[in-house]
Swiss-Prot record:
This is Ribosomal protein uS12 methylthiotransferase RimO. Residues 374-441 form the TRAM domain. It comes from Acidithiobacillus ferrooxidans (strain ATCC 53993 / BNL-5-31) (Leptospirillum ferrooxidans (ATCC 53993)). [4Fe-4S] cluster 1 binds at residues 14, 50, 79. The lineage of its organism: Bacteria, Pseudomonadati, Pseudomonadota, Acidithiobacillia, Acidithiobacillales. Its cofactor is [4Fe-4S] cluster. Keywords: 4Fe-4S, Cytoplasm, Iron, Iron-sulfur, Metal-binding, S-adenosyl-L-methionine, Transferase.
Length: 442
């Protein structure tokens, strides 16, 4: 009996990279390849890399090295693969079979075909309609565009993923419908710049199921909101037109949740970062959003220790944080990225100072988070069962919590529940990160 060619995949980096990996996996399975979870049984290993910060570069290079040591036949793709046209990876690991950049599934497949021809059986249906996914069945990432038109000084993503290219809205909706039909109860809308969706297409009108649909984020969200699942928006710059999404949140069409990458609160540092929004206008917009949608959850990420950041700049950042009272926040100490314009900015902040500021920042945010979560004690919430922990304990998420990056709702032991179930709970206590509750009705 002829051996079925097998592929192993290591997927690193952000949700956009996860979607790229899922597309590669789906096509490989459609071509008859067997997908395996270990090096020993794989004929070829694909490593989807991240190259955004130094730690991610190191992790990616280590993963490539491990795959080469354990297997020997490795195809590299992703953001790190785009650096220096692939020469950066080849310089570190000259034995890799091929190197491609992000969003290049065709090139990855070509490399795999060359090393390991497919053995396709045309009489076997190998791929479900929703494709193959790396996430659990109850949620899925929905990538609506590729690339970015911003020119932030600390970032090299546009040089890796290119300028903004929005998907056609009817194509997105077909994928969303297939994901929901396949069991997804939550769609996490992602891109590099979600609010800019459609700019490159000049908001042209498409058609889905005979209905006109503009290539605009508001129109797309309204259509997604008709699917009867949670729709959660990530990577949303605070553009003025984001206000148009608030009625959809108030009506329950999409979740009252915005992931807004603010990065800093000092106008001077934001200018040096080349960010597209001023801190004072952003704060006014946040306060306005909360007036319109009181239950709105805002998550964000920030960078401390950016070149030239003074004690006064950092104090402004903390003042902004206290005034904004964001619900979920991540903070990173600035890390120089090869090829980023910020590397030329004078006034590098010493590493110990960066870490001191990061710790001080997170201490302020922890107090804010604890206070905001405490307000939910006594409430009833509909949650989605996310995982079963050791001892039969149930871990769920509320509408306020994105998977992997936000908090969870601990329910203790609850008989009869399964991952992906909806359940109503009463919140009994909170800490700085998570909620705790008991099942009211399933």
């Amino acid at each position: 009996m002829k051996k079925i060619p097998s592929i192993g995949v290591v997927s690193l980096g952000c949700p956009k990279a996860t979607v790229d990996s899922e597309r590669i996996l789906t096509q490989l399975r459609a071509e008859g390849y067997l997908l395996v979870g270990d090096y020993a049984n794989a004929d070829v290993v694909v490593v989807n890399t991240c190259g955004f910060i130094d730690a991610a570069v190191e992790e990616s290079l280590e993963a490539i090295g491990e795959a080469l040591d354990e297997n020997g036949k490795v195809v590299v793709t992703g953001c790190l693969g785009a650096r220096e046209g692939g020469d950066f990876v080849r310089g570190a690991h000259p034995k890799v079979l091929a190197v491609t950049g992000p969003n290049q599934a065709g090139a990855v497949l070509d490399a795999i075909h060359a090393a390991l021809p497919p053995a396709h059986d045309p009489y076997t249906d190998l791929v479900p309609p929703q494709g193959l996914r790396l996430t659990p069945p109850h949620y899925a990432y929905l990538k609506i565009s590729e690339g970015c038109n911003q020119s932030c000084s600390f970032c090299i993503i546009p040089s890796m993923r290119g300028k903004l290219v929005s998907r056609a809205p009817d194509d997105i909706l077909r994928e969303a419908e297939a994901l929901v039909a396949g069991g997804a109860k939550e769609l996490l809308v992602i891109s590099q710049d979600t609010g800019a969706y459609g700019v490159d297409r000049k908001y042209r009108t498409a058609f889905h199921n005979g209905r006109p649909l503009k290539t605009r984020i508001t129109d797309l969200c309204a259509a997604l909101g008709e699917l009867g699942v949670w729709v959660r928006l990530h990577y949303v710059y605070p553009y003025p037109h984001i206000d148009e999404l608030l009625p959809l949140m108030a009506e329950g069409k999409i979740l009252p949740y915005l992931d807004v990458p603010l990065q800093h609160g000092s106008p001077r540092i934001l200018k040096a970062m080349r960010r597209p929004a001023a801190a004072e206008k952003t704060l006014d917009r946040i306060l306005g959003w909360r007036q319109a949608v009181p239950d709105l959850i805002i998550r964000s990420t920030f960078i401390v220790g950016f070149p030239g950041e003074t004690d006064a700049d950092f104090a402004e950042l903390l003042d902004f944080l206290r005034a904004a009272e964001l619900d979920r926040v991540g903070c990173f100490a600035y890390s120089a990225v090869e090829g980023a314009p910020a590397n030329a900015i004078a006034g590098a902040v010493p590493e110990p100072v960066k870490e001191e500021r990061r710790a001080a920042f997170m201490a302020v945010q922890e107090a804010i988070s604890r206070q905001r979560l405490q307000r939910r004690v006594g409430q009833r919430q509909r949650v989605l069962v996310d995982a079963m922990a050791r001892g039969g304990r149930v871990i769920a998420r509320s509408a306020s919590d994105a998977p992997e990056i936000d908090g969870v709702v601990h329910l203790g032991k609850a008989a009869g529940l399964q991952v992906g179930d909806w359940v109503e709970v009463a919140i009994t206590r909170a800490d700085a990160h998570d909620l705790y509750g008991m099942v009211v009705s399933a």
